[in-house]
Structures are given as structure tokens and as C-alpha cells.
């Protein structure tokens, strides 16, 4: 069995980092809303494509979101969703 067939384990646990991600996402959300965009659609577009053009420069939203890796943003979103449904692994 090659190493490509094995499941890799990824561990990342830093609650202070999660708070930073939440702060950035909320700031970006507010900036998108102020500019008249659908914040969810724009953030999802950015997360899927990596194209910062989905995020406006308004209120430095583009600079803020680009300080974080997309995989870190996605991980925090998944953890938050699962936590809100009582499913997060402690």
C-alpha cells in the first residue's frame, strides 16, 4: 500500500487563532454588506477560488482576509458549525 492510500491526520488546535479568524470574517462581512454585496456569496467565492477580487478593499477587508490562509478560514468555519450542533470532537 503506497503512502498515498493512507489517511493522513491533521491536528490544529488554537482557540486564540479561532478568535482572530472570527474577528476577520465579521469585519469582512460588514465591509461586504456596506458595499451592497451578498457577504456569504462573496466569502464563499473567495474561499473556493482564492481570488481576492471577491473581497473589496473597503475597510481593508481584502488585506485582512489575505492575512489568513484559506484552509485556516475553512477549518474555523467547520469547527464553528459543528460546535453549534454539538458535534465537535473535544
UniProtKB/Swiss-Prot annotation:
It comes from the Bacteria. Belongs to the UPF0297 family. HAMAP family: UPF0297. This is UPF0297 protein ABC1593. The lineage of its organism: Bacteria, Bacillati, Bacillota, Bacilli, Bacillales.
Amino acid at each position: 500500500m503506497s503512502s498515498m492510500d493512507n489517511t493522513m491526520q491533521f491536528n490544529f488546535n488554537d482557540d486564540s487563532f479561532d478568535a482572530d479568524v472570527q474577528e476577520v470574517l465579521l469585519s469582512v462581512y460588514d465591509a461586504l454588506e456596506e458595499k451592497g454585496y451578498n457577504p456569504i456569496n462573496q466569502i464563499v467565492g473567495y474561499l473556493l477560488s482564492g481570488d481576492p477580487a471577491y473581497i473589496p478593499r473597503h475597510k481593508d477587508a481584502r488585506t485582512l482576509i489575505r492575512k489568513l490562509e484559506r484552509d485556516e478560514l475553512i477549518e474555523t468555519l467547520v469547527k464553528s458549525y459543528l460546535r453549534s450542533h454539538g458535534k465537535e470532537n473535544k
